[in-house]
Structure formats: C-alpha cells, structure tokens
Amino acid sequence: MSSLLIDLKGKELEQEEVELLSHPLVAGLILFTRNFENREQIQELIRSVRQRVKKPLLITVDQEGGRVQRFRDGFTMLPSMQAFQETLSATEQVSFAKEAGWQMAAEMIALDIDLSFAPVLDLGHECRAIGDRSFSSDVKSAVNLATAFIDGMHQAGMASTGKHFPGHGHVLADSHLETPYDDRTKEEIFSGDLQPFQQLISQNKLDAIMPAHVIYSQCDSQPASGSKYWLKEILRKKLNFQGTIFSDDLGMKGAGVMGNFVERSKKALNAGCDLLLLCNEREGVIQVLDNLKLTENQPHFMARQARLQSLFKRRVINWNDLISDQRWRLNYQKLADIQSRWLDIQAAKND
C-alpha cells in the first residue's frame, strides 16, 4: 500500500533516492526550489525519475502563486491569491482567478507534474504562514475566487487540493516552526473558516484536502492532521467528503506533538489521512519505511489506492505547444502585471 510522498535532496536524482522511491510504501514525491535550476533541468530531473523508478509516481509541487512558487525562471509570475481581490474589479477577479488556475496547472502538467497543492482556502491574512496566500477574509469572496481557480485547474487537467482544513487563517503561529493553537469556539470555526471547505465539497470541486497542523483546543486535543474528530467525524461523515486526504508535511515542527516520525505517520493514517508528506527529514523517511507496516488487509486499502489513482494528471501537454497557445501568452503578461501591481501596493504600505 503506497502512502508516503518524499522529497529529493538536489537537482539530480541520486541512486539512494531511486531506491527510496521504489519502496512499496512510497506513492510519490514533492519538488522544492532546491530541486530547480531552470525549465530544462527540472524536466530532465522529472524524466529521470519517471525512467529510473519502475512504477507510477505521483509527482507534486507547491506552485500556488505569489511567494509560494517553487519554479520561477521561465514560468509565469503567478499572483498571490489576495492580489485578485485587491487589484481587480469584481468581474475581473473571477475571470483572472480562473486563468491563474489554468495557467499554473497547464505549466506544471507540461513538465509531467501531476499535482500542485492548491488552492489555499484559509480565511484572512493575519497568520504569517498564510498571509496573502489567502484569497480573502470574506467567505463568499473566498469561495467565488477559489471556485474559479479550481475550474481553471480542472480545465487544464489537474486535480485540486484545498488547504489547510478546517482553517489556518486565525492563528498567528507558523506550523512550520511550532504547533499553533486555535482557542475559538466550535461555532466560530464552523460558521467561518470551515465554510469554504464545506461549500466547495458540496459543489464537488475538491479532489483532495490537506488538514492543518493546528490544535483547535475547543474541539479536540490533537492537530487536525492527526485528529479522528476532524478527519473522520467532520470531514468524512458530516461534510461527506469522498476525496483524498493528505497530511501536511509531517517533518514540520507543528506535527511534533504527535511523536517521532513513525508515530506521526501512524497517527495521521489512523486519523483518516490517505497520503502522507514527509519532507526534509531523510533519516525520518528511512525510519518510516523500515517500521510502518501497511497491508492489503487493512481497512480502506482499496479506497485509498483508488483515491491515489484519481490524482494523476488527466491529460498530456507539450511545453512548446503550450507557450504558442494564445491563451497562455495573454495570461503570461496579464498575471505578471497583477502580481506587480500587488507588490507595489504592499511596498507603498511599508513606506
């Protein structure tokens, strides 16, 4: 049973990484800026992975836009999600959010990448880990823009991943560095932060969801990423979500309250995650591969494997064909202009 997504150290594939990626527990990998030099190099790295690892791997990346864009040189400058609401008219916002979703997904698919973990559905801009990655502080605006972005992704042939369930936007702490606590009442969370997830699930827009490494203290003592309450009771039963549940990176400090890397992995799977991310912790990956035992006899095995298969890219796009497409060319300039305008607005605020 393949459940783990791991990372690569550098810009070329090492033999040890071929062996790790070939392990039966490994379902795929996630690429980072450290793996990228230019488009030709990243395409060659991906080609090497596909050729040397003799099984289908889900290749993923965080190419959200704005400050979370792992590949920049030679790619569209994608706007921060907040930029749509702050720089465009109401009609333009939805139109260009859709184009951004399409542009991002088409470029990644043309590299032979299956999935970019997007969009961010967190409300508000106060959390330093989220900031302008969020579309809006307003539920209706966030849902409208996220719907358009996802429609663009789907049109290009990429599955969507809503994050960070049930909402990371109201904590100031960064879960990369510590475990944040959200002490608001269940009613506050359900009437606000949960709404983008709930509404997009009801519209059948979300193919996958990534929970937060945040403890919602009035609801459960575990981070959402390791919480049966959030993943089984709320996400699966109450919201009737049928798609894939990814853990956020189990190497993050925010996951530390769940124990060592093997314990974190077991807790996340038992809580309801289908696929686990473990990054920047090579020894941790080896520990998990040596000690995590998953078999076809375990509950939900077939459902989890079917969900994994649903995430692979749904079409093939040739890079040269893409960049000669008029839609891509128009978007390339317009989306960069939106981000430039947004950066100017931020710079003026800081002056």
Curated annotation (Swiss-Prot):
Documented EC number(s): 3.2.1.52
Record-marked site positions (Important for catalytic activity): 174
Residues the record marks as active site: 176, 248
EC main group: hydrolase
One BP term from GO: regulation of cell shape
Residues noted as binding substrate in the record, renumbered to the chain: 62, 70, 133, 163-164
Gene Ontology cellular component annotations, sorted alphabetically: cytosol
Pfam families: Glyco_hydro_3 (PF00933)
Main subcellular localisation: cytoplasm
GO MF, one annotated term: beta-N-acetylglucosaminidase activity
InterPro entries in the record: Beta_hexosaminidase_bac (IPR022956), Glyco_hydro_3_AS (IPR019800), Glyco_hydro_3_N (IPR001764), Glyco_hydro_3_N_sf (IPR036962), Glycoside_hydrolase_SF (IPR017853), NagZ_Beta-hexosaminidase (IPR050226)
Entry keyword set: Cell cycle, Cell division, Cell shape, Cell wall biogenesis/degradation, Cytoplasm, Glycosidase, Hydrolase, Peptidoglycan synthesis
Pathway: Cell wall biogenesis; peptidoglycan recycling
Subcellular location, record wording: Cytoplasm
PANTHER family: BETA-HEXOSAMINIDASE (PTHR30480:SF13), BETA-HEXOSAMINIDASE-RELATED (PTHR30480)
Assembly behavior: Monomer.
Family designation: Belongs to the glycosyl hydrolase 3 family. NagZ subfamily.
Protein name per UniProt: Beta-hexosaminidase
Species annotation: Haemophilus influenzae (strain ATCC 51907 / DSM 11121 / KW20 / Rd)
Lineage, top ranks: Bacteria, Pseudomonadati, Pseudomonadota, Gammaproteobacteria, Pasteurellales
Name of the encoding gene: nagZ
